[in-house]
């Protein structure tokens, strides 16, 4: 069964990469719509809020980020709840109301805790696909627009059924937020099952093809516009350093996505940055550099030295936001610092 899944994922990857550059040469959406040129910053958070204390404090987190004059927009990398709480409509509405407190544009990419893992009895025993549909309804009511009071336009895959996959451009940097989640990208069997269901597998195949197309289109846009860097944001940690002996059976859902990022990064002249949550502990590395175990693990045939990745703090360690400063004309395009929460 697992071998068939891998073959199907590979076929989806080939289909996405041969579909063509849908939007290359288009004028890119910009977040936010204001003059570019100088240094600016954006904030990144993820795996928050977890538990009652963080839920109660989350409005203060929003207020603090709103008060940061350098931040032009915010990225939430998914997991808006912990993995052992109920995936209820009421909870989704609560977090959406908190998200609506953000003054500047908010780009939210979906995590596994809010849909993939909702089959668990302590999550309410939901059908994850029903919860995914509800997430899209609640958090993506205006496809092609970010959340936040100062909503900004972005390119969206809503016409393919994936409003959460978006891309935009700002000051010669191409950005993409793509829906890749933990739990082997949602291929871990649901409660009571020994293997993924046909419906579960079909969802993963379709979403994987869309993600690969979005990655492909983002790099195509970057080359067409002579961008200096590409930044990809997602939930899943596909290179989890906290796992000392990773098993491919737990990661094979990520393989075609890693291959697409590696292939596009290797062909791109500038730096590529990958931001993710999922593993909860801040980490910065070059996951596909020469000598990395992940090269052979994912079947990548050559190093990708221009790919950097950053994992944000989350869960119990979610006590800061990442302020990422963009230097469009500097030797290092992105720099970042962790800003402690005030309370």
Please state what every model-predicted region is:
Residues 38, 54-62, 77, 88-98, ...:
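Stable alpha-helical elements in mature extracytoplasmic
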Residues 50, 63-70, 100-104, 137-144, ...:
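Sec-exported extracytoplasmic/periplasmic mature domains
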Residues 320-343:
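A short C-terminal boundary segment appended to hydrolase-like catalytic domains
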Residues 86, 91-207, 289-318, 322-325:
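Extended active-site neighborhood of metal-dependent phosphoesterases/phosphodiesterases
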Residues 66-73, 176, 192-287:
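His/acidic metal-ligating clusters that form di-metal
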Residues 41-46, 72-78, 82, 105-110, ...:
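Structural recognition of the beta-strand scaffold that forms the well-ordered cores
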Residues 30-91, 227:
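N-terminal active-site segment of His-dependent metallophosphoesterases
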Residues 1-30:
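Secretory targeting and sorting signals
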């Amino acid at each position: 069964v697992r071998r068939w899944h891998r073959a199907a994922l590979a076929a989806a990857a080939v289909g996405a990469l041969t579909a063509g550059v849908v939007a290359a040469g288009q004028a890119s959406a910009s977040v936010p719509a204001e003059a570019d040129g100088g240094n600016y910053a954006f904030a990144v958070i993820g795996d928050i809020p977890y538990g009652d204390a963080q839920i109660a404090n989350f409005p203060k987190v929003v207020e603090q980020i709103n008060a940061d004059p350098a931040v032009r927009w915010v990225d939430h990398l998914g997991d808006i709840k912990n993995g052992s709480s109920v995936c209820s409509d009421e909870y989704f509405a609560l977090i959406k109301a908190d998200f609506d407190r953000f003054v500047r544009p908010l780009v939210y990419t979906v995590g596994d805790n809010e849909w993939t893992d909702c089959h668990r009895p302590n999550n309410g025993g939901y059908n994850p696909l029903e919860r995914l549909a509800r997430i899209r309804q609640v958090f993506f009511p205006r496809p092609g627009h970010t959340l936040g009071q100062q909503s900004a336009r972005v390119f969206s895959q809503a016409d393919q059924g994936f409003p959460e996959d978006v891309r935009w451009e700002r000051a010669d940097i191409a950005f993409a937020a793509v829906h890749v989640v933990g739990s082997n990208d949602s291929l871990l069997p649901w409660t009571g099952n020994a293997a993924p269901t046909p419906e579960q597998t079909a969802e993963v195949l379709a979403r994987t093809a869309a993600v690969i197309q979005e990655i492909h289109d983002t790099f195509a846009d970057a080359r067409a516009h002579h961008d200096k860097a590409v930044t990809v944001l997602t939930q899943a940690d596909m290179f989890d350093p906290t796992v000392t002996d990773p098993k491919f059976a737990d990661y094979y859902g990520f393989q075609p996505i890693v291959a697409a990022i590696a292939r596009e990064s290797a062909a791109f002249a500038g730096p590529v940055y990958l931001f993710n949550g999922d593993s909860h502990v801040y980490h910065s590395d070059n996951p596909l550099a020469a000598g990395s175990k992940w090269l052979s693990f994912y079947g990548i045939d050559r190093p990708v030295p221009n790919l950097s990745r950053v994992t944000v703090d989350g869960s119990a360690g979610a006590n800061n936001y990442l302020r990422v400063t963009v230097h469009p004309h500097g030797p290092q395009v992105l720099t970042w610092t962790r800003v402690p929460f005030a309370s």
